[in-house]
Amino acid sequence: MAKKDTTPMMKQYYEIKEQYPDAFLFYRVGDFYELFEDDAVKGAQILELTLTHRSNKTKNPIPMAGVPHLAVDTYVNTLVEKGYKVALCEQLEDPKKAKGMVKRGIIQLITPGTMMHERPDQAKDSNYLTSVISTNSGFGLAYSDLSTGETFSTHLTDFEGVANELLSLQTREVVYNGHLTEANKDFLKKANITVSEPVKVEGEHAEISYVTQNLTDDAEIKATKQLVAYLLSTQKRSLAHLQVAQSYEPTQYLQMSHTVQTNLELIKSAKTSKKMGSLFWLLDKTSTAMGGRLLKSWIERPLLSVTEITRRQEMVQALLDDYFTREKVIDSLKGVYDLERLTGRIAFGSVNAREMLQLAHSLGAIPDILNSLLETNNPHLQNFAKQIDPLKGIHDLIVNTIVDNPPLLTTEGGLIREGVSDQLDRYRDAMNNGKKWLSEMESHEREVTGINNLKVGYNKVFGYYIEVTNSNKDKVPTDRYTRKQTLTNAERYITPDLKEHESLILEAEAKSTGLEYDLFVKLRENVKKYIPALQKLAKQVASLDVLTNFATVSEQNNYVRPDFTVDKQEINVVNGRHPVVEQVMTAGSYIPNDVKMDQDTDIFLITGPNMSGKSTYMRQMALIAIMAQIGCFVPADSATLPIFDQIFTRIGAADDLISGQSTFMVEMSEANDALQHATKRSLVLFDEIGRGTATYDGMALAGAIVKYLHDKVGAKTLFATHYHELTDLDQTLKHLKNIHVGATEENGKLIFLHKILPGPADQSYGIHVAQLAGLPHKVLREATTMLKRLEKQGAGELQPASEQLDLFTAEEASVPAISDDEKDVLDDIQNVYLADKTPLQVMELVAQWQQELKDKD
């Protein structure tokens, strides 16, 4: 509400701000966007702006901060990335022509889910706005990336499914129509997801009808309508690039919860939350941003159809076999900009001339790609090329209209080529002739007045002028020159002739600039008609980029094409490798392992020391399955796999910070998910189930879970455990086999073999692993003593508290009486490598050890 005794401009500000109380209002004043009141105070702090005040002479000056209009995107992005909303209030008329107060209005509400201007490092990330409708039968869910227009919808039975989709999509904003429980609110808050209210839009909108035209499920239709309505309300313009919503069932793809994707580090490293170290990092050698985004979506949604997988494999094989064609395609792809987002900006009306040329250059690369594919003898590559329309007409239209190096702004001229418009060419002739006259006038005035340094200049305030230095102003002909401006070292004048030509030149410039902008808008609207064709082309190019990328990665890393068994669940991976781990190890040092599970083997019970590679082996199997089902080749000598419908994991020992569950509760929840939903066609990875609780509880639960998986589920399961007692289960469970990760002891030191061997491990080597971790020698000695006592009395014969062994009993006397410091010196002596030491260095080491022992006496 407007304050009393305020100016008309501030009254206008308060009226607009009242409509957007939860958003930062960027209010356009001249060349700046201003923030006022609380927006200014908070915005100055977040954006590191200088906080000033308006109406300083009043009792209550108004806090104010501003940003240049040319840099506004940077500041807006900063706020939106932090979860805030920004309302852009623009001047709706030319201030010079306005009668009274300049009209202003909101041209766009930018929210976390509708941000269009991504940073360069976000080019391969999607930004999904999600809409959720609560119904009697469950939930309708729809989502769209405004920058590309792609739109999807599905329906889910419970909020747990909704939460999983939101996390998997990494959505930053959800439009939600139903009642949220406190638990759901807490989840959304911890997940940093902004919750927005639905909005109603008046009248019929073509976008809503177009996007929902293929949907049949009522919940999906409502969710999609709610999504598009919100976009129309916030963006306040035509959204012609929104694509027809694609309905999907989660069961259409290999299902993996967000937790599974995180555990397997498909898109980000679990430790750093960065791309590096993930499967996406390994596989992403794509040449285009849209190819990178498509690759990410393929990794998150592997296929179930052998036919579709084979189609991708055939393309990968063809590109792998033809190195020169592949390299030519890659070179051409490097010249393709982000067609999807360029198309979005064209529809949005925010594209500039340089981006329009980027579109043309991208289209210019398509014929080279097609020629490379058509020149091969491979029918798969040829058929792919024949389906692509290069849209040559659009390319020619743009390059024949826009100059080679246009300015960034579309409102200051210099955009349009000569010959495009006769009227524009006439304006330019007038401008050129006028400027030629100015040059001739400058020469003439120098000659007439004798002022050799006289010059004709221009600025936006005073227009054209004649500048004369103070040392020559006595030579100025006062009968023709009228003083216009006084400077420190010069005077500026005008003449009647100069004023007359100024009007002609400026009028031509203004009309030329205006006409150029009109011609650019006309070009943009013409290209806009081809948005569906451009979007189709973008998808085809992105797909080719990913498949070419698969061929390159497969060749570089010696991957093999996997085969699939449709009628039986058998795994036969020979010398499989963890695709990511092998890349960060020294070349040739990775130890490959087989995974062979026939019809009669459902469960591998894996034992072996910690740090020996059990978890790597399990993840390796899952990643090979995922790579196979996205159409990529896999890290192995050979691989025959079933088509998995779901993957379940229980890997890692971290609390679930979003749901607030403890480690053990997370263990049980993830285990229950697998027990409830896994089928015979699923892959289950359980690592150290039961470690989050007491020993006997954990062992009992782990054993019961193994038995249930064996008797009731029948899924292919890799079950790693430190409970060696469970290895006896192979006596009663006929589909369970024991395997272990090999290790050996040399000179009292543990050597990991990293090789999977048949049968159970004979010991756990826990104290040796603790030694590798650097635990104090005293702790290790006491642990060794305690272990010997326990082994003597029997692993299962734990005594009552009153009879428990004292860690410091007389038996410890059998341990040599040596201090920790002495042990440190002995370790140094044992570990020193004398071959790379000079005699002098050896003498220095001996002296150092002697001194250390003396100091401890």
UniProtKB/Swiss-Prot annotation:
Keywords: ATP-binding, DNA damage, DNA repair, DNA-binding, Nucleotide-binding. PROSITE patterns: DNA_MISMATCH_REPAIR_2. Transmembrane segments: none annotated. ATP binds at residues 608-615. NCBIfam families: mutS1, PRK05399.1. This protein is involved in the repair of mismatches in DNA. It is possible that it carries out the mismatch recognition step. This protein has a weak ATPase activity. This is DNA mismatch repair protein MutS.
